[in-house]
Regions:
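Helical hinge/lid and interdomain linker segments adjacent to catalytic or ligand-binding clefts
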Residues: 114-194
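Hydrophobic targeting/anchoring helices
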Residues: 1-115
Length: 194
């Protein structure tokens, strides 16, 4: 959701030199779901731009025995290219507005709110594990900046985020978003809400 710059990577294990297996051939069963699903993920920065992985790492070129079978790159490469070709160009149906700065502030200044941090991350993790089609993330800070610069950016999306604290700029932006026809799901404790 927040990065010091625009770089983030997609890493995929085609071979494993440390354990006696080649994930593409053995664990993945030559099925590309672990390529297409992660490569459909995007982040939205403060300018409202869609960010995709800037680096693709493939580990490793050789298998446990030091062999470099051409079958694996021959089969994997077309899926990587297709996933990149079909990469997101707009926010997804659901956009996770991740409270990066809020969680950081709570961890430092309000240790009593640490359970909320864990709850928020675990709630979304479990939702994804249960099939919620979440592929887009932005931070609360980036959301507030992006919506100012591109008011229609999230028009086709449902935002999902924590219940904002009373009187915060996030609360005001989310209320304005909903009043202007935006769709929003909030979750978590409402102890500090309006």
């Amino acid at each position: 959701a927040e990065l010091p710059d625009n770089r983030y990577l997609f890493r995929y294990y085609i071979h494993d030199p440390w354990w006696l297996n080649s994930p593409w051939l053995d664990r993945y069963g030559r099925e590309p779901h672990d390529i297409y699903l992660p490569m459909s993920v995007s982040r939205i920065d403060r300018e409202g731009n869609i960010g995709l992985p800037t680096h693709l790492n493939f580990l490793s070129i050789d298998d446990t025995y030091g062999n470099m079978p051409t079958q694996v790159p021959d089969e994997v490469t077309p899926h990587i290219l297709k996933a990149r070709y079909d990469a997101p160009t707009a926010p997804g149906p659901l956009v996770w507005v991740y409270p990066f700065d809020e969680y950081h502030d709570w961890a430092i200044n309000s240790p009593g709110r640490l359970p909320e941090v864990y709850y928020g991350d675990w709630f979304i993790r479990q939702a994804i594990n249960n099939g919620v089609p979440l592929n887009t993330v932005t931070s609360t800070t980036s959301f507030q900046s992006a919506i100012e610069k591109k008011p229609e950016l999230f028009r086709e999306s449902v935002l999902i985020t924590i219940v904002p604290d009373q009187g915060t700029s996030l609360e005001k932006r989310l209320i304005a978003f909903v009043k202007n026809g935006g769709k929003l799901i909030v979750f978590g404790p409402a102890d500090h809400a309006s």
